[in-house]
Amino acid sequence: MELVFLGTGAGVPSRGRNVTSIALSMLNERNTIWLFDCGEATQHQIMRSQIKLSKLEKIFITHMHGDHIFGLPGLLSSRSFQGGDSNLTIYGPAGIAEYVETSLRLSGTRLTYKINFEEIEPGVIFEDKMFIVTADDLDHGVRSFGYRIVEKDKQGALNAEKLKADGVEAGPVFQKLKNGEIVTLADGRVIDGKNYIGEPQKGKIISIFGDTRETSSELELALNADILVHEATFEGDKAKMAGEYMHSTTLQAAKLAKTANVKKLILTHISSRYDRDASKELLIEAKTIFENTEIAYDLAVFQVGE
């Protein structure tokens, strides 16, 4: 899995940063892409990346401010124009369905695929055999969600060396043993596949937050995450301003990462007041509290778990 930051700016686009959008690429895991927020010109950013709209399976909207949703109508239309025909699910606050449907209707846009809308409340919003996604309220004036994506533990690897040492030759029987089945061998021995499977591989945890000021719900959403993506609209000494504007500072994000025992913090949603050099200072500031911090730039790619 990898995170591709398509837009990392706050509020309005700037020369160095487009507005918010993050792609979670899971091509190896499920051959799909999940998108978190879709600010204006997200589809242009996708054209500059390796992301393919045909692989897009789900879109998660954190809140209804324009810098997080104005790119949706164009992106959905282009996906259709490019031949996308698989169904798409959009998760988000109340109003997301009306916004998308009205935009498409008034522009006379007809899609070649169906959109399923899930207007969410806190709790589990999606689960299958591979992932579970939960959402909770943040604090941003309008309803804003944070998402916690948990990859379920994977079955351990089959110990082929142990099987060979026990005189079991490679072949179709290996697949049955890998599935944990009890198998009778040609020589009459009965072996249990469970005895040859290693420890389960721990799944990854990714927490992606919408805009927010400090709030108690952040801790549970971020707890023990491999990656926490958190807004850092302001530098540390502007905590009062951040609170008034319902945003966070670098230091607040770093303190949360430390308290929640996350492995890596990625800062995004950077105000246009900070150019590239000033952004480096934001990173240095956050690292004084949480060393394993990165600051995202447009089109930056981060591997999950590295």
UniProtKB/Swiss-Prot annotation:
Disulfide bonds: none annotated. It comes from the Bacteria. GO terms for molecular function: 3'-tRNA processing endoribonuclease activity; zinc ion binding. It is an enzyme of class 3 (hydrolase). The active site is at D67. It catalyses: Endonucleolytic cleavage of RNA, removing extra 3' nucleotides from tRNA precursor, generating 3' termini of tRNAs. A 3'-hydroxy group is left at the tRNA terminus and a 5'-phosphoryl group is left at the trailer molecule. CDD domains: RNaseZ_ZiPD-like_MBL-fold. Binds 2 Zn(2+) ions. Keywords: Endonuclease, Hydrolase, Metal-binding, Nuclease, tRNA processing, Zinc. InterPro entries: Metallo-B-lactamas, RibonucZ/Hydroxyglut_hydro, RNase_Z/BN. Zn(2+) 1 binds at H63, H65, H140, D211. Zn(2+) 2 binds at D67, H68, D211, H269. It holds the Pfam family Lactamase_B_2. Its cofactor is Zn(2+). The keyword Nuclease applies. Its EC number is 3.1.26.11. Homodimer. Zinc phosphodiesterase, which displays some tRNA 3'-processing endonuclease activity. Probably involved in tRNA maturation, by removing a 3'-trailer from precursor tRNA. Belongs to the RNase Z family. NCBIfam families: PRK00055.1-1, PRK00055.1-3, RNase_Z. This is Ribonuclease Z. It comes from Listeria monocytogenes serovar 1/2a (strain ATCC BAA-679 / EGD-e).
